[in-house]
């Protein structure tokens, strides 16, 4: 009797049958949800990857091969398509213009956005919330509504059809998002570190650049990548504000190259130009994708 009593579990440790059934049903539901989610992700990956692989494969074909056997491997790998796109279509010049404009705008917007977000997040002064909401409203302002005022404004300042004018326009439209993204990072930083820097003799500028800004490096990296992707693919602003062909960016050059070859299209060179346009974006995202995901989740929880 004592052995039976010892092996018998207390009533409080035994789960009712209904609870076990609910647990099994929940586990089964989770498995079904995971299976459906993975299937949808695989389908989405196929939809995205297959066209990209087709474009890459077609960039090494001749026009005849692309039209006769679009889904086969190239009979002869035509690397000269990239040379034709780079020189004959001036993709090389447009690529350099895009690098100059985007990198310059990115440096300015990251510096100004970080300073603005830091001041609004760490200092108390009259009108702070008003400035924050005005900057936030810039996220909802459609770009096309500002095209005409921007055109005349840049024309009055002598910045129309110039790289500095396009850079300043890029900065103006990327600044609200940068400030909004970095605001939560600076608010979450410990105030004791800032006070310790002041006690050690650092001024506000030195404390910002040498102490607080390095601590917000994950957020800075993520927002820099998002800004790079948006500015690199920008089309409407340069088309309206940068009509000088020598200063065209890559999106303008690609549109002009695709539309100029109406009847006699060199599809191989066209696909090569597309690859040249897309590769920088893919490289940036593939290299920094973990930092993007980590920074976004970190900023969300903060």
Curated annotation (Swiss-Prot):
UniProt keyword terms in alphabetical order: Cell membrane, Membrane, Sugar transport, Transmembrane, Transmembrane helix, Transport
Record domain ABC transmembrane type-1: where: 95-288
Keyword Transmembrane: yes
Regulation: induction: Constitutively expressed. Slightly induced by GlcNAc, (GlcNAc)2 and chitin. Repressed by DasR.
GO biological process terms held by the UniProt record: transmembrane transport
GO CC list: plasma membrane
Topological category with respect to the lipid bilayer: Multi-pass membrane protein
Protein task: Part of the ABC transporter complex NgcEFG-MsiK involved in N,N'-diacetylchitobiose ((GlcNAc)2) uptake. Responsible for the translocation of the substrate across the membrane.
Subunit structure: The complex is composed of two ATP-binding proteins (MsiK), two transmembrane proteins (NgcF and NgcG) and a solute-binding protein (NgcE).
Family statement drawn from the similarity comment of this UniProt entry: Belongs to the binding-protein-dependent transport system permease family.
Protein name from the UniProt record: Diacetylchitobiose uptake system permease protein NgcG
Organism field: Streptomyces coelicolor (strain ATCC BAA-471 / A3(2) / M145)
């Amino acid at each position: 009797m004592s052995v039976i009593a010892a092996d018998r579990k207390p009533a409080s440790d035994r789960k009712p049958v209904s609870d076990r059934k609910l647990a099994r049903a929940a586990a089964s539901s989770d498995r079904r949800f995971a299976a459906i989610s993975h299937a949808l992700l695989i389908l989405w990956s196929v939809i995205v990857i297959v066209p990209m692989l087709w474009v890459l494969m077609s960039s090494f074909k001749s026009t005849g091969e692309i039209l006769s056997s679009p889904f086969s491997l190239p009979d002869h790998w035509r690397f000269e398509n990239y040379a034709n796109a780079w020189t004959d279509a001036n993709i090389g010049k447009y690529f350099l213009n895009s690098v100059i404009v985007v990198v310059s705008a990115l440096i300015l917007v990251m510096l100004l956005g970080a300073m603005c977000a830091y001041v609004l997040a760490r200092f108390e002064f009259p009108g702070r919330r008003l400035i924050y909401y005005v900057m936030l409203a810039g996220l909802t302002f459609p770009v096309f509504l500002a095209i005409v005022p921007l055109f005349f404004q840049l024309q009055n300042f002598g910045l129309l059809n110039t790289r500095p004018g396009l850079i300043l326009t890029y900065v103006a439209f990327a600044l609200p998002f940068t400030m909004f993204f970095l605001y939560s990072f600076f608010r979450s930083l410990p105030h004791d570190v800032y006070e310790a820097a002041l006690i050690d003799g650092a001024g506000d500028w030195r404390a910002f650049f040498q102490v607080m800004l390095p601590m917000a490096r994950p957020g800075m990296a993520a927002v820099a990548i998002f800004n790079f992707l948006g500015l690199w693919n920008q089309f409407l602003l340069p088309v309206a504000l940068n009509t000088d062909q020598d200063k065209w960016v890559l999106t303008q050059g690609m549109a002009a190259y695709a539309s100029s070859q109406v009847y006699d299209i060199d599809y191989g060179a066209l696909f090569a130009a597309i690859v040249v346009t897309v590769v920088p974006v893919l490289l940036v995202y593939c290299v920094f994708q973990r930092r993007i995901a980590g920074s976004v989740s970190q900023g969300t929880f903060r």
